[in-house]
Amino acid sequence: MRIVEIVPVTKTKYRVVTDEQLAFMLYKGELSRYRLKENGELSAEIFQEIFREILVKRAKLRAMHLLTRMDYTEAELEKKLMKGEYTPQAVKIAMDYVRSYHYLDDERYVARYLSAYQGRKSRRQMQFELERKGIPREMIQRRQEALDDEEGCVDETDMIRQLLEIGRAHV
């Protein structure tokens, strides 16, 4: 594998692009440690070491860091990691890792979201927002039905009346 270019992103962070259209980020010290240079050769062994020791580890830590701040859906977290320019394989491994420890669980995310917004948002609005976050429609409907069975169905017309009364009180 040949290194086509090494582009500085910040003072210490560089994007390494290979002839196989593979791009990944490394810090200045890592470039020096592995003696990577533009138009230089990147052996499969060195790339595997970089992948295992740096890229996968960094992707896992980033995923866990993001999840400590707030819950993400699988699609949101994957998009966020890809935006960080981790390789697709590193993102997949990181996603599998956080999923294996149940740090990432779309079913739980949907249940918490529906519980939090039930009574304030319509079913359709919640479904739309969850679909936009990458949740499959079937999962949303299944969780809505389960929530209705647990807590009793919320009548949307009563909710609209309550909101109208609140609006009139503020006028």
Region spans (language model):
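Calmodulin-binding IQ motif helices
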Residues: 171
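An alpha-helical, amphipathic repeat domain used for nucleic-acid recognition
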Residues: 1-168
